[in-house]
Amino acid sequence: QKPGETKEVHPQLTTFRCTKRGGCKPATNFIVLDSLSHPIHRAEGLGPGGCGDWGNPPPKDVCPDVESCAKNCIMEGIPDYSQYGVTTNGTSLRLQHILPDGRVPSPRVYLLDKTKRRYEMLHLTGFEFTFDVDATKLPCGMNSALYLSEMHPTGAKSKYNPGGAYYGTGYCDAQCFVTPFINGLGNIEGKGSCCNEMDIWEANSRASHVAPHTCNKKGLYLCEGEECAFEGVCDKNGCGWNNYRVNVTDYYGRGEEFKVNTLKPFTVVTQFLANRRGKLEKIHRFYVQDGKVIESFYTNKEGVPYTNMIDDEFCEATGSRKYMELGATQGMGEALTRGMVLAMSIWWDQGGNMEWLDHGEAGPCAKGEGAPSNIVQVEPFPEVTYTNLRWGEIGSTYQELQ
């Protein structure tokens, strides 16, 4: 994709790096929308039509090979991110799923470093990551996601991908989806884009889920055929941590009767606990609300070890076979040590109504309640706001008011 004439204007976001001794110090970052959300069109004289749709390789007439594809497909900048449902205000990032004019941008964005030319690389093994969230406008079926992906620091900037991270190129995750461009290059052979993925937060106001997803490849891997499938190189299900799945139903939800009351903002703390050799052993999630630490729930299910953290024993017992086979918690830690990119998004699910997240064993939502046609009746303008993104030493990113 060749960058076009339209200017790209990245919203600025203040984030924090924390130590026990020095507290949290502000840092400057910028936000970039995924490259495939940018307007992509054919070069002048090549007629109307785009350069391919999600799930498919690019069209052969404009993209017979990588070189022609780079010349024939122009990616424009985005001068006004608010038109895509993305706005920042100091330390806050707001993502709107639906705009007042009815458009549904469903944005996915990444965190750039202060140069805007590279992604901010997070190395979280042995550290913790914390943010504040307002999830009040996220009914059943919505998914506000904040997660890490083992993308290339420059968005794999290259001769035929001159835009790179500046334009949001290089996305990959453990689902190994086929997209018309991978690492900014025409995906002529229709391969899948795979990499390690750490889902810190996938949630709405009714249910919430943490899940490491391992792959047995480093960085972005182009899969083909069986490699892209369920038994392939990445763990598609992840090792999920959701209170409802272990019979704890009073922990998280809308109202005072829940320990975490999603009708008010709250703080989400995720610790990546390592052993002395620096290997990831456990992932520990808890919350802070109204100045009080809300400890993690403990599992309450037969056949599942009594625990308040994700570890190999828990993953094994909950049937996360692919996770265990493809590297398990130590493998996830190796990716977190190498460095991962922060992605944040908001979306709904036309096909499955997000029922894996909040229905049946996973939550209180009724069958079909999360259908997009129902969501808009309940909440015409679903959105999420993430504030005060901060990371650093264990115990440094949150405090309890005495």
Curated annotation (Swiss-Prot):
The disulfide bridges present are C18-C24, C51-C73, C63-C69, C140-C365, C172-C195, C176-C194, C215-C234, C223-C228, C239-C315
E.C. code: 3.2.1.4
* Pfam hit, one: Glyco_hydro_7
Q: Name one GO cellular component term.
A: extracellular region
Q: Which residues carry this modification: Pyrrolidone carboxylic acid?
A: Q1
A GO biological-process term: cellulose catabolic process
Question: According to its UniProt record, which reaction does this protein catalyse?
Answer: Endohydrolysis of (1->4)-beta-D-glucosidic linkages in cellulose, lichenin and cereal beta-D-glucans
Superkingdom classification of source: Eukaryota
InterPro entries attached to this UniProt entry:
ConA-like_dom_sf (IPR013320), Glyco_hydro_7 (IPR001722), Glyco_hydro_7_sf (IPR037019)
Per the Swiss-Prot or TrEMBL record, the active site comprises: E197 (nucleophile), E202 (proton donor)
First-listed, main subcellular location of the protein, grouped into a coarse class:
secreted
- Drop me one GO molecular function for this one: cellulase activity
Task: Show the CDD domains listed in the entry.
Answer: GH7_CBH_EG
Q: Which UniProt keywords apply?
A: Carbohydrate metabolism, Cellulose degradation, Disulfide bond, Glycoprotein, Glycosidase, Hydrolase, Polysaccharide degradation, Pyrrolidone carboxylic acid, Secreted
Q: Where does the record place it?
A: Secreted
Glycan attachment positions: N89, N247
Protein family membership: Belongs to the glycosyl hydrolase 7 (cellulase C) family.
| PANTHER family from the UniProt entry | 1,4-BETA-D-GLUCAN CELLOBIOHYDROLASE B, ENDO-BETA-1,4-GLUCANASE CELB
Function of the protein: The biological conversion of cellulose to glucose generally requires three types of hydrolytic enzymes: (1) Endoglucanases which cut internal beta-1,4-glucosidic bonds; (2) Exocellobiohydrolases that cut the disaccharide cellobiose from the non-reducing end of the cellulose polymer chain; (3) Beta-1,4-glucosidases which hydrolyze the cellobiose and other short cello-oligosaccharides to glucose.
Kindly state the subunit structure of this protein: Monomer.
Name of the protein: Endoglucanase 1
Which species? Humicola insolens (Soft-rot fungus)
